[in-house]
């Protein structure tokens, strides 16, 4: 009641299997209204890369440069696995309290923000990311993950290079695998390349259906695999520590996990959790209205609530 009564609240939904357990909406938001899920979009990269890995088309230990010869020094020697785990140190930063953060330049390149000069493509921007100042490599020596939305776009280019088809076709199949009631909307850059780093928009119910694909360990509603069961099991077991206030979680293969559930947050107040053991998935959508649109202390109560609901009982 407290969290769904906040002035920033948009929608919340919970499903168990094919049953809608709970839903709640703000007075100015409808059940059939799509909402940006921001970085919860990144979980789609887990499903796509996991499928390609299981099919033997991607080696998690190979370098990004081996897959994408055009990539710059910021990713050339990083492995696919390190990019999946946000375990790469380079010249890209994502500090929303800094008006000059690289992430805002990335948004301009991908069409999410007006550019101040020319209109570079997302690929050109990603290719130009270099090493961190003074660094000789991309090794992460911080002891915790280094969150970079550019990592997901790198993985998207990897998926397109090794998948043999356009990324949009993967997203069409994802919509079918989730069994969306409405539509899976996704933003693209100026060249039509889908933005897996944060471009997907779904209703609250359909966000739960999307998360349930991971909760079923990669199976679509028709029982056919879209992601990868062994890859998702490895996701639950692996990962890099996250700093406080999420120190009890790990960042693993484009998800957050505590070894029991899989989830992800989104800029502005979104969070999704799916629990493979109980078959429950819960989504919370909101629009946090402060100076930066982000507050790390806002998320822990939401995460705790969704995790407790998805634990069942």
Stretches with model-predicted labels:
Residues 19-22, 65, 99-140, 165-184:
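Short, charged, amphipathic alpha-helices and their helix-cap/turn boundaries
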Residues 18, 35-60, 83, 155-159, ...:
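Active-site SXXK
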Residues 150-158, 198-219, 270-287:
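Active-site-proximal alpha-helical segments within enzyme catalytic domains
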Residues 181-185, 232-284, 289:
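Active-site Gly/Thr loop motif
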Residues 294-313:
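Short, gly/Ser/Thr-rich active-site loops of penicillin-recognizing serine hydrolases
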Residues 1-29, 272-274, 279-283:
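A short, well-structured edge-of-sheet supersecondary motif
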């Amino acid at each position: 009641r407290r969290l769904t009564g906040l002035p920033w609240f948009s929608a919340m939904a919970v499903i168990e299997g094919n049953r809608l357990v709970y839903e709640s909406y703000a007075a100015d938001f409808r059940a059939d209204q799509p909402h940006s899920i921001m970085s919860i979009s990144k979980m789609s990269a887990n499903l796509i890369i996991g499928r390609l890995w299981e099919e033997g088309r991607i080696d998690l230990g190979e370098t990004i440069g081996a897959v994408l010869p055009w990539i710059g020094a910021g990713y050339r020697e990083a492995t696919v696995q390190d990019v999946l785990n946000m375990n790469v140190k380079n010249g890209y930063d994502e500090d929303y309290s800094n008006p000059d953060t690289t992430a805002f330049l990335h948004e301009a390149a991908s069409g999410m923000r007006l550019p101040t000069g020319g209109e570079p493509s997302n690929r050109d921007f990603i290719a130009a990311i270099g090493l961190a100042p003074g660094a000789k490599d991309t090794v992460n020596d911080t002891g915790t993950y280094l969150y970079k939305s550019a990592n997901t776009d790198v993985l998207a280019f990897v998926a397109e290079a090794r998948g043999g088809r356009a990324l949009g076709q993967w997203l069409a199949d994802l919509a079918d695998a989730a069994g969306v009631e409405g539509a899976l909307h996704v933003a693209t850059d100026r060249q039509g390349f889908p933005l897996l780093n944060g471009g997907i928009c779904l209703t609250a119910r359909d966000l739960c259906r999307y998360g349930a694909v991971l909760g079923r360990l990669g199976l679509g509603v028709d029982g056919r695999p879209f992601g990868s069961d062994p890859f998702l099991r490895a996701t639950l077991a692996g990962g890099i520590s996250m700093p406080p206030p999420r120190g009890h979680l790990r960042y693993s293969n484009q998800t957050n996990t505590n070894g029991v559930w899989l989830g992800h947050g989104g800029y502005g107040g979104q969070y999704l959790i799916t629990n493979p053991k109980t078959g429950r998935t819960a989504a919370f959508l909101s629009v946090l209205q402060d100076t930066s649109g982000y507050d790390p202390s806002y998320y822990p109560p939401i995460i705790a609530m969704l995790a407790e609901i998805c634990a069942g009982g």
